[in-house]
Structures are given as C-alpha cells and as structure tokens.
Swiss-Prot record:
Post-translational modification: The disulfide bond between Cys-192 and Cys-259 has not been observed in X-ray crystallography. This may be a consequence of the X-ray radiation.
Temperature dependence: Optimum temperature is about 50 degrees Celsius.
Signal peptide span: 1-17
Name used for this protein in its record: Mannan endo-1,4-beta-mannosidase
Effect of pH on activity: Optimum pH is 5.2.
Membrane spanning residue stretches: none
Enzymatic reactions: Random hydrolysis of (1->4)-beta-D-mannosidic linkages in mannans, galactomannans and glucomannans
Subunit structure: Monomer.
GO MF annotation: an example: mannan endo-1,4-beta-mannosidase activity
E.C. designation(s): 3.2.1.78
One GO term of the biological process aspect: mannan catabolic process
Length: 367
C-alpha cells in the first residue's frame, strides 16, 4: 500500500507543467500568467522546418529567443506550412502523403532551443492572408474533406503526438487570418455561417474563396485531431479583427464553440483561447480594436491574446503603452509583429516594459 501511495504521489507531482485555461485566464503550473512576446513569423518564408531547413535559420531563430528572454518575454508565434510550399508532402492529386523525415526533428530542435530560453512556442499551421502560387494545395484541404483528413492522418496527428511532451510547446494556431479568404456578405439562416456583418469590412482581401462553414470545418477538424492525440493541447486561431471574434457590438464570433462544432461536427474541435490581430488604418484604430476596449467589453468566455500589433501601426501608441494596455485591460497575452518587419528595438522595448510584472499575471516563469 505504501509503495502504491508513493507511486501515485510521484505521478501526481511529476506531471509536466503545461499552459492551461482557467475561466478567462491562462495558467502555467497553477499560476495566472500573461503571454508576452513576439511573432518570429519566419526566417525563410515557408521553408524553416523540414527538409533539414531549420539549420539555415537556426542562428536567427536562436538570436530572437535570446533577445526576447533577455527583455523579459516568454513566448513566440512562428509559422509552419503557410500554403504548403515545402511541407507537408502532397501527391499530384492534392492529398497529403506524409511529412519528410526531418520536419519533426527540426521543430523539436527549435523547441529545445526555446526551452533553454524559457520561451513557449506557438506554431501557426496555415496562412489565409495571402493567395500565392501553392495555394492550390491549401485550397484542396479547405474544400475537400478527404484531402483534409489525409493531412490530419499523415501529418498533423503525427506532429502533435511526437511533440506533445516538449516543455516549450505552447500550442497550435490553426490558421493565420482565415478572414483574408472568407466570402463576406453571405446570407444564411444559420447565424454561424452568415457573413453579412463582414460586408465592406475588408474581409476577403486575398479573395472571396471560402464560406464561413468551410473555414469553421477546417478549424474544427484540426483542433479535434490535435486534442485526440494530446488532450491537454492549447489551440487557437489568429483572427484578423474582432468583427469575427465576438458576438458583442453587432458582430458575430465565427470561432465560438457552437459555431465551430456546427461547421465541422466534432465536439472537441474548439479553441482553447481566442487570438485577435489589430492595426491602425490612416493612423486610427477601428472602434472594435482591443486597444479601444477592455477585454470584458467583448463578453467572451475564454482568454484572449492580442496576437499581432506594432507601434508603427499603433495609432500613435508606443510599444510600451500597447503592452501595458494588453496587460492591464484583461487580455491574456500580447505578441508584437514581427521579427521580420518594422523596428525590432521598438518591439523589444514593449516586451521589456512588462519584465518581471506579476500584478495582472506572471510574465516570467520557468519551463
């Protein structure tokens, strides 16, 4: 009996600390935390992982990790497949046949480097903000469930399963700005699929390609697949604007649990936390911007991270003031955009502004 009790005690205390959700807060190892960091985005666009490609950008990746750690940050968002330029492996008919034999080892090498710097990594799988030469690969996954299932079976689940015990894996971002390819202005008797509220909003800038239902299914199926192999995984979507991320203010939340399940039918295929991007237009934020509201104004029941922003498109706000706003107005994280764009020093000043803060969530913590 004593040995059994000790074994149970060891198992319960030896569990790996992970990011988790508590109401509208993010927790790590039982403590309320705030995700403070930046978008690496990429070093070599769409060619950073797999086919031994990580070695080419390794020094830049690790320099970013070092900078963020030294300025008090704790997390990085980085892009993976984008539109399928180099990963995963596709056949001539658009089905995913697998991943090359270095994709997981490349990702793991990056995660190990991040762990040495106490930084959580969030991999963004796909990108909806552009439509480029290999978009036909992503398009197949969006419109054909057989092709989407081939990606899930032969790439996504093997990746998620192989990396689930990596301490630096913060979570999975299914798609960057799906609204870039949404069909705005569509009427539907199902509110989840009605996009009339996006008419004239700028949504669909890369092409009016997919219905809200197709986007929701794409997210729902992948979120469910990740959780099937890793029930504790954190999943999000990098939404372009609060107009698609809240039911408040006359908008509609395309990524609510109800709408994602309605679109794809998989009960577990929901988000762990919301993520929104915000930039000014003609030096002004839209009235729906998170930099004009406290988190509570959006009436969401899950945490929200401001996943892209920067001083250069911040309506006159400094990087420091933007991080301060996100931290003190109820949000759960702030990732400035990006290492590949605009002033890195400006971004680092914003990250440093929150260094060692604990009053609205712990910013520095060990992995």
């Amino acid at each position: 009996m004593l040995l059994t009790a000790l074994a149970v005690l060891f198992a319960s205390t030896g569990c790996q600390a992970r990011l988790s959700v508590s109401g509208t807060n993010l927790n790590y190892n039982g403590h309320h935390i705030f995700l403070s960091g930046a978008n690496q985005a990429w070093v070599n666009y769409a060619r950073d992982f797999g086919h031994n490609q990580y070695s080419k950008g390794k020094s830049t990746f690790e320099s970013t990790l070092s900078d963020i750690q030294s300025h008090g940050g704790n997390s990085v968002r980085v892009w993976l497949h984008i539109e399928g330029e180099s990963t995963p492996e596709f056949d001539n008919n658009g089905y995913v046949t697998g991943i090359d034999n270095t994709l997981i080892s490349d990702m793991r090498a990056y995660l190990h480097a991040a762990q040495r710097h106490n930084i959580l990594i969030f991999f963004t799988l796909w990108n909806g903000a552009v439509k480029q030469s290999t978009h036909y690969r992503l398009n197949g996954l969006m419109v054909d469930t057989r092709k989407l299932q081939s990606y899930i079976d032969h790439a996504l689940k093997p990746m998620a399963n192989a990396l689930k015990n990596e301490k630096a894996l913060g979570g999975w971002d299914i798609m960057n700005e799906p609204e870039g390819e949404i069909k705005p202005g569509e009427s539907s008797s199902e509110p989840c699929f009605d996009t009339r509220h996006l008419s004239g909003s700028g949504a669909g800038w890369a092409g009016h390609l997919y219905s809200a239902q197709e986007i929701g299914r794409f997210v729902n199926w992948q979120a469910a697949a990740i959780k099937e192999v890793d029930p504790g995984a954190m999943v999000t979507v990098g939404s372009w604007n609060m107009k698609a991320d809240t039911d408040a203010m006359g908008f509609h939340n395309l990524y609510s649990d109800h709408c994602l399940v309605k679109a794809g039918g998989k009960q577990s295929g929901t988000l762990s936390f919301y993520q929104v991007h915000t930039y000014d237009w003609q030096n002004h934020f839209g009235n729906e911007s998170p930099f004009k509201h406290s988190f509570s104004n959006f009436r969401l029941k899950k945490p929200m991270v401001i996943g892209e922003f920067n001083q250069e498109h911040g309506a006159g706000m400094s990087s420091e003031s933007m991080f301060e706003w996100a931290y003190t107005k109820g949000y759960s994280g702030a990732w400035t955009w990006s290492r590949t764009d605009v002033s890195w020093n400006n971004q680092l000043r914003g990250i440093q502004h929150l260094k060692s803060r604990t009053d609205h969530g712990q910013v520095q913590f060990g992995l």
